[in-house]
Amino acid sequence: MNRLGRMSLPLRSPACLICQTRTTTLIPSSWQTARSMATARLRRKVSRMALSPDVAKPSLNKDRKKRERPGPFAAMNQTEARIRDTPRTRSQAALKRSGDSKEEAQKKESPLYKALKMQTTLAPVPYGKRTAVKAKIADITSFDQFPLLPVVRNSIVSQALPGLMEVTPTPIQRLAIPKLLEESKPDKKPVKTDDDEPHYDQFLLAAETGSGKTLAYLLPVVDAVKRAEAVDKELEKKEEEEKAREREEKMKNKAFDIEPELPPLSNAGRPRAIILVPTSELVAQVGVKVKALSHTVKYRSGMISSNLTPRRIKNTLFHPDGIDILVATPHLLASIAKTEPYLLSRVSHLVLDEADSLLDRSFAPTTTEIISKVAPSLQKLILCSATIPRSLDNLLRKRYPDIKRLTTPNLHAIPRRVQLGVVDIEKDPYRGNRSLACADVIWSIGKAGDSEVSGPYSSFLEPKTKKILVFVNEREEADEVAQFLQSKGIDAHSLSRDSSARKQEEILAEFTEAPPPPSPDEIMLAQKQRRHEDPIPFEMPKRTNSGGSTRRLPNTKVLVTTDLTSRGIDTLAVKTVILYHVPHTTIDFIHRLGRLGRMGKRGRGVVLVGKKDRKDVVKEVREGMFRGQALI
């Protein structure tokens, strides 16, 4: 109540009701604080603040000793080695971390040829057989150990292998020449039978590329021809004596009833041995080898192909003096044999060089027809190849089950002296441009120095011209790639089945003939020219502005070709092969890279790999080359 005696209302607090309720909830009541203090005493203490009840108990394992760590002088004055009886075993986790576990080892050791097994094209040769052959031919070190005629043996160094300091037989020559000579029977008479079984000796010579297979079959064939020639001369001499006696008796008995004698059958167009090859280029190459031996051994040889004129073919076949050894292609020989029935009547030796090609679908009917026509007089059928495809292996097992296979230890293996590099064209700076990558590789090889040491006077001579082969899969791309390389300043030419015969001969001559070593006169002439051509001091040479591109790659020649030159062509002058496309099969790999490493020389191969190419196949081929193992 106030002084006036009236009731007064309490004054409002300055805070609102919401704030008052908030403060009441935040401030605990007295009974809540008392309860929380009581429960705090019953809480469990933190483990780190309490000791374990087992602290005072002794250890259960009494034999366990504390590991002693040797001090700095622990190794002094020791009388016995302190070596643990059993090594410490590592846990599985430690083995997995280090990668030494058996499971990891089994995962890493994958088979060598996984991708190649899916496209197996070659017939396998057991490694046990390879090792046995290697031990068998180890004792043969010279051509003098072969039972060849002296005139044939003396012609090897002078005609077959001129310019070599040391002449030793290669593995296929050590293996094949004794077998072909051992079974040789020049006086063997043909057996006439009605069945289809062959009654002549059959041989298969299989060796790696560039191993001297041509000489391996050519020397026994030449030896057999000369022995048969000597036997024929003796028979002719006896026949002439008998005819002379008969003529005298007839003259005595019936002087006026003499019948005219028939002229003797001429040897014109009747070769003793025939060598079949698949291409005209191989005809020229093998024909040169056969002709070289004829200079000293004295026999008549000839070669016929589609590159020659009909008049020249007729003069070669039907020469009055006859012909002993003929080199030809199957289709041309079969077409001539249809009009000349006596052409194949005297053949005793038939050689199928590059047999895997001559017995495929395109050549098999013609080749089989020739074999059947020469069968009555045939003594030896010799098949020669660098690869044994599965198709050829099945054909031989079916048609010639008794054939004698002479295979070298390194069959189907690319020589280890050949290095294979891989260029990914999808990366910068090519970005999928295969032709640009090819040109860049050629420029890199052309600008690099020559790794071979030519001799002490090589600096006075002109630099060697590098020869490079580029293989493409399609015939149409050969001209396109060659034109692109020419636009980049590279001396490139294309060679395919569409090229003319004259162009093929000119181009192949540059890539197959290795330049001979310089003579002393050439070295002296080069020294004189170097002195005269030395520039005058302090005088700059005059520059000539020539039209066109001035950026040219010197001392480098490139041949863009197909598989036309991958079979049997003896490219001794080539040291680099570029595979513009990845080959379809391992057979193409072997033949294309087989243009390198011939006769013990080194080589380098480069394969261009794109996005759609089988990189796993290239990888396995490269690993097989590094290990020296045979491809499959």
UniProtKB/Swiss-Prot annotation:
A Gene Ontology term for the protein's cellular component: mitochondrion
Amino acids binding ATP: 207-214
Motif DEAD box: positions: 353-356
Listed Basic and acidic residues bias regions: 97-111
Transmembrane segments: none
Coiled coil: none
Domain Helicase ATP-binding residue range list: 194-406
Known EC number: 3.6.4.13
Transit peptide as recorded in UniProt: 1-37
Gene this chain is encoded by: mrh4
Protein name: ATP-dependent RNA helicase mrh4, mitochondrial
Top enzyme class: hydrolase
Organism listed in the record: Aspergillus clavatus (strain ATCC 1007 / CBS 513.65 / DSM 816 / NCTC 3887 / NRRL 1 / QM 1276 / 107)
Matching CDD domains: SF2_C_DEAD
Function: ATP-binding RNA helicase involved in mitochondrial RNA metabolism. Required for maintenance of mitochondrial DNA.
Membership in a protein family: Belongs to the DEAD box helicase family. MRH4 subfamily.
